[in-house]
């Protein structure tokens, strides 16, 4: 399903500012993804299992850090999924420019 969103701006400079803001946000998402993947690798190395295995088969009692370790690992995995989804949406966005001003 496709959704169309229209943003009216006063001038072309405003459009450039919006596009730049989106690019900056995508860069921040990429950095967040990298940081989160590093954290997940740390958990995987510490416990000797993949995040997928952890999410499918493990409980808090299975980890040396118990509940807190479990919650942090699961939270990082959930965060990664959300960041990747958001970045994917923005990367698939299409932008079109039209002039709706009556004097042009």
What is each residue range found by the language model?
Residues 1-104:
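Extended, charge-rich alpha-helical interface modules
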């Amino acid at each position: 399903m496709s959704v169309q969103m229209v943003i009216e701006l006063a001038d072309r400079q405003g459009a450039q500012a919006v596009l730049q803001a989106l690019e900056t946000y995508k860069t921040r998402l990429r950095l967040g993804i990298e940081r989160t993947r590093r954290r997940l690798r740390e958990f995987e190395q510490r416990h000797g299992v993949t995040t997928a295995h952890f999410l499918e088969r493990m409980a808090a009692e299975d980890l040396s850090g118990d509940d807190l370790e479990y919650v942090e690992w699961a939270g990082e995995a959930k965060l990664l999924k959300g960041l990747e989804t958001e970045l994917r949406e923005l990367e698939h966005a299409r932008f079109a420019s039209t002039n709706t001003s009556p004097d042009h």
